[in-house]
């Protein structure tokens, strides 16, 4: 492509500060921005980023259709919510208008195994209008490509086991309570674990209705299976309490969590495949003890066994850089809803983004 890639930013919160700056620094340009927050609408995106004005004002998301029809951008970056149903509006709008889109929405990483109906609708609309929709972010490398690359150096695999942890203290009281922090193990079982205790048949019915709420790893396991050419025969999810052997004080909950009570939870997803490789991954959210920190740990078990650990990852920056570096792959991909498992491996971009677009 012999001109700059034209990008629209949908959602101008914390993530957009990085995605927009990275877009400019990779030789592309932001031509439009949208939000629903009245405190942001009307501001120049430079003000949002904390830099000089760029001459692009954040507009009300309700005007997105009209503005996108006028702007005709190459791609839209959507950085708003975590469930595919919550980003349906901007993604479907892009699909209808023939605009490529990439989102940080965690479920969008591989939504076909958690909301197949909506994924199919987005896929059909994008195919009809010759554009590509996908999801990317931190998991593209650290829960995905990193593991598939290690698999490439392994003779025989029997199991892939992964975990990623985060401190619920960093995300507010609603998330801490949703993770069962502060509950006795008995109450945790009643209020948290029992919600996801169902048969495979019942879970499948909920998925087929588009009403399932997956943990982040649910979609990651599906992505890994596709990337590695595995055939999924069953997948289950359970919530397991996390505990500590001494009392912990939670500033978010403003309470002392007794030793042995739940400090949070792990959502464990187990995938069995026809090829007899088991993928077991977990997302651990809990109140940290003083010596604990964010950690991403994956093991490939077989011949040989290999474990890789990423300590204290800069998740926000890595997420946003992955999104921006993926832009040429999205623009070069076939039309439809295309998971990044079906795209080339994510690469560092040392030239302007347009030079990678075919």
Q: Language-model segments: which ranges?
A:
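N-terminal glycine-/serine-/threonine-rich beta1-alpha1-beta2 phosphate-ribose binding loop
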Residues: 1-96
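Active-site-lining helix/loop region of Rossmann-like oxidoreductase modules
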Residues: 6, 10, 14, 152-286, ...
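Conserved active-site and cofactor/substrate-binding residues in soluble primary-metabolism enzymes
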Residues: 10, 14, 18, 71, ...
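Short, ordered loop/turn segments at secondary-structure junctions
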Residues: 36, 81, 105-109, 138-139, ...
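ADP-ribose/adenylate-binding Rossmann-like module
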Residues: 78, 82, 94-114
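Rossmann-fold NAD(P)-binding glycine/threonine-rich loop
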Residues: 106-130
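Adenosine-phosphate binding glycine-rich loop
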Residues: 129-158, 165, 320-322, 326
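C-terminal helical cap and adjacent loop that interface with cofactors, partners, or active-site loops
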Residues: 286-358
């Amino acid at each position: 492509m012999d001109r700059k890639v034209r990008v629209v930013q949908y959602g101008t919160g914390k993530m957009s500060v990085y995605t927009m700056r990275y877009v400019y620094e990779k030789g592309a340009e932001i031509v439009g921005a949208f939000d629903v927050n009245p405190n942001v609408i009307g501001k120049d995106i430079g003000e949002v980023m904390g830099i000089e004005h760029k001459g692009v004002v954040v507009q009300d998301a309700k005007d997105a259709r009209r503005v996108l029809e006028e702007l005709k951008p190459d791609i839209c970056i959507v950085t708003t919510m975590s469930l595919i149903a919550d980003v349906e509006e901007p993604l479907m709008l892009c699909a209808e208008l023939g605009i490529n889109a990439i989102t940080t929405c965690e479920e969008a990483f591989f939504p076909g195994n958690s909301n197949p109906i909506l994924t199919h609708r987005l896929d059909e609309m994008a195919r009809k209008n010759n554009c590509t929709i996908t999801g990317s972010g931190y998991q593209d490398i650290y829960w995905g490509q990193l593991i598939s690359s290690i698999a490439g150096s392994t003779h025989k695999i029997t199991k892939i086991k992964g975990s990623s942890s985060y401190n619920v203290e960093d995300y507010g009281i609603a998330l801490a309570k949703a993770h069962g922090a502060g509950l006795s193990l008995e109450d945790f079982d009643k209020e948290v674990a029992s919600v996801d205790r169902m048969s495979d048949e019942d879970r499948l019915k909920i998925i087929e209705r588009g009403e399932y709420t997956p943990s982040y790893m649910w979609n990651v396991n599906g992505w890994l299976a596709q990337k590695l050419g595995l055939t999924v025969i069953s997948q289950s999810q359970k919530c397991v309490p996390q505990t500590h052997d001494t009392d912990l004080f939670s500033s978010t909950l403003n309470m002392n969590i007794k030793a042995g009570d739940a400090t949070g939870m792990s959502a464990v997803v187990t995938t069995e495949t026809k090829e007899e490789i088991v993928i077991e991954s977990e997302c651990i959210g809990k109140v940290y003890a003083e010596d604990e920190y964010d950690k991403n740990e994956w093991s490939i078990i077989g011949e040989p066994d290999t474990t890789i650990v990423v300590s204290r990852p800069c998740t926000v920056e890595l997420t946003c850089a992955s999104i921006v570096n993926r832009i040429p792959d999205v623009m070069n991909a076939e039309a439809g809803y295309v998971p990044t498992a079906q795209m080339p491996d994510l690469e560092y971009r040392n030239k302007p983004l347009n030079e990678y677009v075919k």
